[in-house]
UniProtKB/Swiss-Prot annotation:
It holds the Pfam family V-set. It comes from Mus musculus (Mouse). The gene is Ighv1-61. This is Ig heavy chain V region 3. Residues 50-54 are annotated as: Complementarity-determining-1. Residues 86-117 are annotated as: Framework-3. One of its GO terms (biological process) is adaptive immune response. InterPro entries: Ig-like_dom, Ig-like_dom_sf, Ig-like_fold, Ig_V-set, IgHV. This germline gene belongs to a set of closely related genes that could encode V regions of NPb antibodies.
Amino acid sequence: MGWSCIILFLVATATGVHSQVQLQQPGAELVRPGSSVKLSCKASGYTFTSYWMDWVKQRPGQGLEWIGNIYPSDSETHYNQKFKDKATLTVDKSSSTAYMQLSSLTSEDSAVYYCAR
């Protein structure tokens, strides 16, 4: 049986009037089908606990799909029902970093993933 892989591209976007607001993600992940991956999004230039962090998926040639969001102050989450069993959103307030864990990966999970404030 041949080796197969899933490629996840990670992109960060930030909104707001302050140009120093930054969201930093690793460039790409290469993972095996059936495995899980934890994507990170490190925030700087604003009060991390005061803004919702959203996660969005875009497959090649397709539109954006909202996965869910998390409020870092109390870790309240909302999920698109489609991703309820796929994605788990968490934060580490001490490092101002948001995380999204994707489980049971398949070829359908090969996409660009955005974190956005």
